[in-house]
Swiss-Prot record:
This is Ribonuclease HII. CDD domains: RNase_HII_bacteria_HII_like (cd07182). Residues 11-198 form the RNase H type-2 domain. NCBIfam families: PRK00015.1-1, PRK00015.1-3, PRK00015.1-4. GO terms for molecular function: manganese ion binding; RNA binding; RNA-DNA hybrid ribonuclease activity. Its EC number is 3.1.26.4. The gene is rnhB. It comes from Sodalis glossinidius (strain morsitans). It catalyses: Endonucleolytic cleavage to 5'-phosphomonoester. It is found in: Cytoplasm.
Length: 198
């Protein structure tokens, strides 16, 4: 962890993070993790700074040793209905609600917390400052990357396994060529433009 962080006075602290706000396709995926102080997971860091192999290894450790972990999501249709910002907060609420152990306090990556039934705090750059948030970022990233790999098998022409649905030049080219899948976010401008031209 980089900058030091002063933890709140609480016993069961959950970290929450999201992956997938920027892609043009698929769900926004969030995770909540309560780590076990008796069984620490070494090497936690912001998921974006880790190799895929390292993320996968840490995913296995986190899911094995954490006191509790869960995934929450908001689908493309929900993103289109309520916008990506609100959908992300909703997915975070779902992740916290799905925890098998109820946390005393929730630490959320970013600058805004969803409405939760327990105290919470937003931490800017929390995924590189707070172990619980780093763990959540890894769970969310691995989960979403696996979903994109599965989607790639259904629609290999779009290259989802490589770009994970982000608006790369390749993705935009294939979107223009093949049109949108049912999994694309219709409210996002590049997808909307393709649909308007269809």
């Amino acid at each position: 962890m980089t900058e030091s962080f002063i933890y709140p006075a609480a016993t069961l602290i959950a970290g929450v993070d999201e992956v997938g706000r920027g892609p043009l396709v698929g769900a926004v995926v969030t995770a909540a993790v309560i780590l076990d102080p008796a069984r620490p997971v070494l090497g936690l860091a912001d998921s974006k700074k880790l190799s895929e192999k390292r993320r996968e290894a840490l995913y296995e450790e986190i899911t094995r040793y954490a006191l509790a972990w869960s995934v929450g999501r908001a689908e493309a249709s929900e993103i289109d209905s309520i916008n990506i910002y609100q959908a992300t907060l909703l997915a975070m609420q779902r992740a916290v609600a799905a925890l098998a152990v109820v946390p005393d306090f929730v630490l959320v990556d970013g600058n805004r917390c969803p409405l939760l039934p327990m105290p919470s705090q937003a931490i800017v750059k929390g995924d590189s400052r707070v172990a619980e948030i780093s763990a959540a970022s890894i769970i969310a990233k691995v989960t979403r990357d696996r979903e994109m790999a599965a989607l790639h098998l259904q629609f290999p022409e779009y290259g989802f396994a490589q770009h994970k649905g982000y608006p790369t030049a390749f993705h935009l080219e294939k979107l223009a060529l093949h049109g949108a899948t049912v999994h694309h976010r219709r409210s996002f401008a590049p997808v909307r433009r393709v649909l308007e031209l269809a």
